[in-house]
């Protein structure tokens, strides 16, 4: 039978060596699910709360034993006897058990671990792949990878202000070829950086983290690497950026302090800069181009670039339907970044994706900078036919685990698998 008979959480480590929550769920019939919870470095002000212990003598205050105990002592007794396939009812129970707007009582890291482990146990009970359980028979779209190959900002110890510079192999015929193209460009970039005497150590998300003369130089260097790898920038491969601009926004003067370049810009000047970069380079996506509370700036950016560039809200929307609804109403952005730990349950995550699609917004399924070997987001990307996934460079097992899972899914789907490439950006004038 599909009834839950045991729930157990433990403290494990993520890709940065920080503690995180792992949850296991068992059913009466032997169904089993395990989930590991990711963690972000640049976090949005309105994200659900990630509960940390605060004991400075243990993991520098970053322990998660409180969240683990919340699963084992509070959530587990309430879950026992539930039908594991009742995902919506279970998520509703978890939300009500916490009782706060931001999941600050039990912790989003505790709640999410349970939510995903339940889904995995249900898929195991039914003996079907996770993506099929989550999305049904119509789960067939492999995502275009958004591969972060130059790291800056909070993800690297260098002088680059923009947090992520990414490549998107939109000209590939399928996911397998897209991954090959991305990997070859990644290796090409390493040789380009080496030839310039630049650092080829990698950052949190597997991308290179060199000191560069400017943010624009990162774009120039990536274009050079694409060409050196034998591909055509703008035709076969597009560029994307995650500015994570809340990290260099100064609340006191309301301006953007690009310390790597020694430049201070207003919102309008930031929009001018993005417009200039889009005119020079094949950029198809910009994430968090302005501060999460700079709604007027985001509106201006959308007015200027929204018809030809995907404008993704991460800190802006935090996978939250209330924040997304506000953005839709105000004509801000045209895409949402989906991070399961920003909101805390699978049900709320899927609600945000559905709202985005109804409004003509795209959805980008995303990892966090502190990741694990858990590959759930790969299944979510296919389950929702989102068409895009952002999960780092083809480097470090915590990133590659997601890409390898997508390769497996593409094999399982065989001739029914779809890869939409440039058509993924259905709401742009391409």
From Swiss-Prot:
GO biological process: glycolytic process
E.C. designation(s): 4.2.1.11
Molecular function in Gene Ontology: magnesium ion binding; phosphopyruvate hydratase activity
Localization: Cytoplasm; Secreted; Cell surface
PROSITE patterns: ENOLASE
Top-rank taxon: Bacteria
Keywords (A to Z) from UniProt: Cytoplasm, Glycolysis, Lyase, Magnesium, Metal-binding, Secreted
Cofactor entry: Mg(2+)
Gene Ontology CC entries for this record: cell surface; extracellular region; phosphopyruvate hydratase complex
Keyword Signal: no
Sites where the protein binds (2R)-2-phosphoglycerate: 163, 339, 368-369, 390
Pathway recorded for this protein: Carbohydrate degradation; glycolysis; pyruvate from D-glyceraldehyde 3-phosphate: step 4/5
Residues of the active site: 205, 339
Database matches in InterPro entries: Enolase, Enolase-like_C_sf, Enolase-like_N, Enolase_C, Enolase_CS, Enolase_N
Gene3D superfamilies: Enolase-like C-terminal domain, Enolase-like, N-terminal domain
Binding site for Mg(2+): 242, 287, 314
Pfam families per record: Enolase_C, Enolase_N
NCBIfam families assigned: eno
Record family assignment: Belongs to the enolase family.
Main function: Catalyzes the reversible conversion of 2-phosphoglycerate (2-PG) into phosphoenolpyruvate (PEP). It is essential for the degradation of carbohydrates via glycolysis.
Protein name, as recorded: Enolase
Species whose genome carries this gene: Bacillus pumilus (strain SAFR-032)
Gene that encodes it: eno
């Amino acid at each position: 039978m599909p009834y839950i008979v045991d729930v157990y959480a433990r403290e494990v480590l993520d890709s940065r060596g920080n503690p995180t929550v792992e949850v296991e769920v068992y059913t009466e019939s032997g169904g089993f699910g395990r989930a590991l919870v990711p963690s972000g470095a640049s976090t949005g002000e309105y994200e659900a709360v990630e509960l940390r212990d605060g004991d400075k003598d243990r993991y520098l205050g970053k322990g998660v034993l409180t969240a683990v105990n919340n699963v084992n002592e509070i959530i587990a007794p309430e879950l026992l006897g539930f039908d594991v396939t009742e995902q919506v009812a279970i998520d509703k129970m978890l939300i009500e058990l916490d009782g706060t707007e931001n999941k600050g009582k039990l912790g989003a890291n505790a709640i999410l671990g349970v939510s995903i482990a339940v889904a995995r146990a249900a898929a195991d009970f039914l003996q079907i792949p996770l993506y099929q359980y989550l999305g049904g028979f119509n789960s067939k779209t492999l995502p275009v990878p958004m591969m972060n190959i130059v790291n800056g900002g909070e993800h690297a110890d260098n002088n680059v202000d923009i947090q992520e510079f990414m490549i998107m192999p939109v000209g590939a015929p399928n996911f397998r070829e897209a991954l090959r193209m991305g990997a070859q460009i990644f290796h090409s970039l390493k040789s380009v950086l080496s030839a310039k005497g630049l650092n080829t150590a990698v950052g949190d998300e597997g991308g290179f983290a060199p000191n560069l003369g400017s943010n624009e130089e990162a774009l120039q260097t990536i274009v050079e690497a694409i060409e050196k790898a034998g591909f055509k920038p703008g035709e076969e491969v597009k560029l994307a950026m995650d500015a994570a601009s809340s990290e260099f926004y100064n609340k006191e003067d309301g301006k953007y302090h690009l310390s790597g370049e020694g430049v201070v810009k207003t919102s309008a000047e930031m929009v001018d800069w993005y417009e200039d970069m889009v005119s020079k380079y094949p950029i198809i996506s910009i994430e968090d181009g302005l501060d999460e509370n700079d709604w007027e700036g985001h509106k201006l950016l959308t007015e200027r670039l929204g018809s030809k560039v995907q404008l993704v809200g991460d800190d802006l929307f935090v996978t939250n339907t209330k924040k997304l609804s506000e953005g839709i109403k105000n004509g801000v952005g045209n895409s949402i970044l989906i991070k399961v730990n920003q909101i805390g349950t699978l049900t709320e995550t899927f609600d945000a994706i559905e709202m985005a699609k109804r409004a003509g917004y795209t959805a980008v399924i995303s990892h966090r900078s502190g990741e694990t070997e858990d590959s759930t987001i790969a299944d979510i990307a296919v389950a929702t036919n989102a068409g895009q996934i952002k999960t780092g460079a083809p480097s470090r097992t915590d990133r590659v685990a997601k890409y390898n899972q997508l390769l497996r899914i593409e094999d399982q789907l065989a001739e029914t698998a779809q890869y939409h490439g440039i058509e993924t950006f259905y709401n742009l004038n391409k």
